[in-house]
Amino acid sequence: MNEKKEFKPYIPADKVMPELTVTSVIIGVLLAILFGGANAYLGLRVGMTVSASIPAAVISMGIIRFILRRDSILENNMVQTIGSAGESVAAGAIFTLPALFMWAQEEGTAMPSLVEIALIALIGGFLGVLFMIPLRSALIVQEHGVLPYPEGQACAEVLVAGEEGGAKAGTVFAGLGIAAVYKFIADGLKVFPSEVDFTIKPYKGSAVGADVLPALLGVGYICGPKVSSYLLAGGSVAWFMIMPLIALFGGDNIIGPALIPVSQMSPSQIWSNYVRYIGAGAVAAGGILSLIKSLPLIVRTFKQALKGYGKKADGVESRLTKDIPMMFVVLGIGVLAIIMWLIPAIPVNLLSAIIIIIFGFFFATVSSRMVGLVGSSNNPVSGMAIATLLISSAILKATGAVGMKGMVAAISIGSVICIIAAIAGDTSQDLKTGYIVGATPYKQQAGELIGVAVSAITVGGVLYLLNAAWGYGSTELPAPQATLMKMVVEGVMGNSLPWSLVFAGVAIAIVVEILQIPVLPFAVGLYLPIYLSTPIMVGGLVRLYFDKKKGITEEERKTKVNQGILYSSGLIAGEGLVGILLAVFAIIPVGAATLGDAINISKIINLGNIGGLVFFACLVATLVAFINKKEKKTK
């Protein structure tokens, strides 16, 4: 207890600095749009998103301190608070909402409107922030030293080391620029294929390849060798064990859900017709298993949170203890419940809206404590979403809400809960950063609400754009989580799934759990095409080399690893931005074709698979070069 009372933030309570300013809001909003769009594209492509807090903080320092010549750590903290909200809204939205687009495509129903998507994202995002306001004291302040909030602490360290911000921001922008040019050459000009693949003729049913893209290299480096290897292990089991066995035993038989004989199928068709259902079962089981393993922690968290609900750290009211007033929080939650009840975008009655509020608060509490202990990347949001969808689908079916209407309602409810969990986790990391650097809580909470509002309005446009360009469930945008959530709802509502394949995936997940291997990354690798796992593994191997490199001090190792993380963040952002730009090109008509077709020069220059591998090797070399780059000390 003494340790908590004696904690002194970087900026003391009696010192007032610029914080929620016009500058911080404008830069934060721009970064929220940037990282929200980039993460939406990344998540729809590979089923993973990355935290935007640290790159947003670094870019902010580069702009505010070194371009605008202003010096306020709290202003920089506000920028990363607003900016990281974009990534979290995108993460919650892409897990579920693309299912509505896929149904519209398959069943001929109406597409969800931009207003409906914005309302779902706004309600989920606002609730996620509002739930965290009374929990801040209990989880962030009173549990300081108990809940580490790793990303929050890391971001605070970056902010405190602000004098290095200029050089670090340059690393992020370099990654962004290189990835943007690379992506444009690969998927815009199509000088070389971004997916290189090789069939193994003697080993029928199998194939190997890689999506040689910057974002995947960056994801692998940031996730590290362990997570990358689990993903590749899952992919290897699918593509080198399960698929060849299906090809061997399937023969000339037509086995549902496929409509042609197995012998006539390519490896991709075998994956699409059979393996993705096995993978879906494994991912669903992995999400639920992670939730079950967390149950003791969830119960303990809930008890402690209710006990300390809204309690101040001490009796003294100061700048550092001021939250948004509780009256505003309660009123806001009540208004959002009424809006859910009244708007057609979320087709629920008042009782269901109240149930969403109760479940939402429960999952917000769980999400916050989970990220506090194990970090945002290990937060079982997919498990919470699956649990919500199973419960809501079962309730809707029991009350007669079946067919497409019931399925849309289930996904809408699941979307709100998913966004609540994602935003609550992000908000708690940001509030921990603010607690360490000495930010004013109510200003940070207001910043989160601004970031959520902007991101909710823009995420619908991004989803529409990407769907119009390539369509969800395509090779370009497989939308793995949303496809899984769609399958879960269809399975409960219509019994339309090939359950034997799904349960085979569940069995694999249970075996993996018994072997004490983390189930979710393995299951995601099983579910996704192996082309995504291989470049991620390359990034993981680069990280492993520098994690284990001999002949350097621990301080040098930490510096090199962090430089790689910043450069990798730039790679992810750069590819995401050009991916969205190319989506715009794909729908702009030029004569009888599109602008995307007009810039395609593959008939003039096409370097083929070998060219793709050479370009990717050069990209890996740039990552290594930036990791080894000597840091310039700026004063």
Predicted regions and their residues:
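Alpha-helical multipass membrane-protein architecture
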Residues: 1-635
